Amino acid sequence: MASSRVSDLPHQRGIAGEIKPKNVAGHGRQNRKVLGDIGNLVTGRDVATGKDVAKKAKQPQQQTKAEVIVISPDENEKCKPHFSRRTHIRGTKTFTATLRARSKAASGLKDAVIDIDAVDANNELAAVEYVEDIFKFYRTVEEEGGIKDYIGSQPEINEKMRSILIDWLVDVHRKFELMPETLYLTINLVDRFLSLTMVHRRELQLLGLGAMLIACKYEEIWAPEVNDFVCISDNAYNRKQVLAMEKSILGQVEWYITVPTPYVFLARYVKAAVPCDAEMEKLVFYLAELGLMQYPIVVLNRPSMLAASAVYAARQILKKTPFWTETLKHHTGYSEDEIMEHAKMLMKLRDSASESKLIAVFKKYSVSENAEVALLPSLDDFSVSCA
């Protein structure tokens, strides 16, 4: 069958046998067979014979093969280290840093002032080149946007009721395990709201809940839910009331939440109190939170004053001499005489904290997690040391 099928196709055999290359008149060149020679060069070989077809197929590859140039380093020349632009930039002083250094030299800055930002020179998040300008801005803002004396304009609220509210908020803050920034912002919102509008006594705790809800949303990664605040208040208020108070607070403060609280200055001044260990840091925050309970200390003074006074009092208690260094004076902007009276007030609060009915702050700093700084012995000769 196979042979009969082949014999049935004579025209195919004729095509295969009869097609011959024709000469082009006047040129003496042969036509190229289909896929016989796809090159443009004339080799003079007979394509029809089929000889050297493989060689012709490889020939263009040999002619068009890219030349690889291998560069070998000179044996007598040493290899240069890899140049990193990022490393080069880090090792070079920026224009801002140069101007700041010249400004310090022009202002006659003493060598006794320690550069507390040197350890963060390579930390981009620390913003070392701008940190001094940032805190100068904070000092300006706290003077312009201070909280006015509002107790006289609140007929149903007095200083004692405010202290009770702050004591309860400290306890709620501890139970929710919130960040320190949240507590300071909460108290700031409470005082600012009270200075702007009248609040009834029965709504004072609701004000604290709304302020802490806002502070949590602003500072925390995982903020407690509204129902958590309803539960912590023993269902004294419902969800709708808490949300309504939140909206009212934001409206009164005009959504201005980014404010310099005492915590902002505490973080900076603790860093300036070199050397500073964990015990001293906890003691500074303990004294500062005791100050938050007192209306005159918080409302009638700037946040930076409370922070500086807490650092000074802590150094007195731990007998870190000198009590007020040139570094602290430079970064706080306060002299020792300016903060001494406020430090005495914090010391008195500390001495009476264990006997007070409002013991949330005392309990918070009596545990090992906070170095038990609330249990440190009192400093009887504090007034003598300050004299």
From Swiss-Prot:
SMART domains: CYCLIN (SM00385), Cyclin_C (SM01332). Residues 1-29 are annotated as: Disordered. One of its GO terms (molecular function) is cyclin-dependent protein serine/threonine kinase regulator activity. Keywords: Cell cycle, Cell division, Cyclin. One of its GO terms (biological process) is mitotic cell cycle phase transition. Pfam families: Cyclin_C, Cyclin_N. InterPro entries: Cyclin, Cyclin-like_dom, Cyclin-like_sf, Cyclin_A/B-like, Cyclin_C-dom, Cyclin_N, Cyclins_cyclin-box. PANTHER family: CYCLINS. Belongs to the cyclin family. Cyclin AB subfamily. This is Cyclin-B1-4.
